[in-house]
Regions:
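Glycine-rich, low-complexity segments
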Residues: 2-39, 175
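Solvent-exposed, conformationally flexible loop/turn segments
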Residues: 39-51
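Extended, low-complexity regulatory regions
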Residues: 54-58
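Terminal beta-strand-rich extracellular "head" domains
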Residues: 42-43, 59-141, 145-175
Length: 175
């Protein structure tokens, strides 16, 4: 304890025991979704899957690992309307959860981000990044999809359009 060892570049270290105390945080795998182009619209305050059909599937190597999910999609809200985003999680052979951010936070209408447009201001557009660290406790394949809903107002909100790409990726993080 307290000793310092200098290891030259290119050296190989062989351990005959158990290496401990190094902590987690290593990226076990990276998965990118195939970017999609497409528009989904809704007038509902209930979450719907959007993003032009984009989905992100990852199979964790350990049930104790966490998954960092990120989606980047264009949102639009007609004047005097708001839009918020969340993520759907579907575990192969298990449950599908709409709005995993809402489910964890206990909020029914906040989601993982969004924006609102002012009255008499036309349609507002914004590229919104969704980030969530999930603890799915499984080694089954998990499919994540971006979701969105109208936050306030009575008009139409959109995710994606015919000229913008929705993209996403996931990182499995060892704990």
């Amino acid at each position: 304890s307290g000793d310092t060892f200098t290891i030259p570049s290119g050296a190989t270290i062989t351990n005959s025991g158990t290496a401990t105390g190094f902590g987690g945080g290593k990226v076990a795998q990276y998965v990118a979704a195939t970017p999609t182009i497409g528009e989904t619209s809704t007038t509902s305050g209930t979450l719907v899957v959007g993003g032009g059909g984009i989905n992100l599937t990852i199979t964790p190597s350990s049930s104790s690992n966490k998954i960092l999910i990120a989606f980047h999609c264009l949102l639009a809200a007609q004047e005097d309307n708001g839009v918020f985003v969340d993520i759907q999680r579907a575990i192969s052979g298990g449950a599908t959860t709409d709005g995993i951010f809402n489910a964890e936070s206990g909020s029914a209408s906040q989601g993982a981000g969004g924006f609102g447009s002012a009255a008499n201001s036309g349609t507002w557009y914004g590229m919104v990044g969704q980030f969530f660290v999930d603890s799915p406790s499984t080694t089954s394949a998990i499919t994540y999809k971006p979701m969105f809903a109208r936050w306030f107002g009575s008009g139409t909100v959109y995710m994606g359009n015919n000229a913008s790409i929705c993209s996403g990726y996931a990182l499995e993080l060892e704990t």
